[in-house]
């Protein structure tokens, strides 16, 4: 999902789309999983209407296939009973897009730290930078850590990052 999309008449259009997807199934056990690029503008509405958000961990974006595989693995775990719990923190920082490379630099360090900090209790760590050219209040660096069951574990790692 391109998570920085918005229109003049609909800010954060992807939040509207995710909410619509959540409303479709009559069974709340149907997972709603989204993969997104690193330039996502994350809102509480997106987090609340998905079971898990999985961001790319490379910029340039070359890991879409691996993130789709990760989403499929998470879905399989959910069908087996896993109840993911997500902690979401948005920081008041908007990095210029050219500084959001993942091979080296401060943003790469955040991505690497999150990936290295994953344990069996943590199913995903996503650090997204937002899209600097979006004129939105929900723009900026966001950390979403999803635990397999324990929100406190997810929150602790999100705050640490």
Predicted regions and their residues:
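Aromatic-enriched hydrophobic runs in primary sequence
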Residues: 24, 30, 81-86, 134-136, ...
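Conserved anion/nucleotide-ligand pocket segment
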Residues: 68-72, 76-119
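Active-site catalytic microenvironments in core metabolic enzymes, especially phosphate/sugar-handling
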Residues: 30, 41-43, 61-67, 87-98, ...
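Core alpha/beta catalytic barrel or barrel-like domain that forms the active/cofactor pocket
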Residues: 1, 39, 85-88, 135
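Active-site histidine-anchored catalytic micro-motif
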Residues: 1-81
């Amino acid at each position: 999902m391109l998570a920085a999309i918005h229109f003049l008449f609909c800010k954060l259009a992807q939040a509207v789309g995710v909410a619509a997807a959540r409303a479709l199934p009559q069974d709340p056990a149907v997972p709603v999983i989204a993969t997104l690029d690193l330039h996502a503008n994350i809102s509480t509405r997106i987090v609340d209407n998905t079971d898990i958000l999985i961001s790319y961990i490379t910029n340039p974006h070359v890991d879409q296939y691996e993130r789709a595989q990760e989403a499929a693995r998470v879905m399989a775990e959910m069908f087996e009973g896993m109840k993911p719990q997500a902690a979401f923190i948005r920081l008041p920082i908007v990095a210029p897009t050219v500084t959001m490379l993942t091979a080296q630099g401060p943003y790469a360090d955040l991505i690497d730290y999150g990936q290295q900090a994953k344990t069996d209790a943590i199913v995903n760590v996503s650090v997204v930078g937002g899209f600097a050219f979006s004129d939105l209040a929900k723009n900026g660096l966001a950390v979403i850590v999803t635990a397999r069951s324990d929100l406190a574990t997810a929150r602790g790692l999100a705050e640490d990052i």
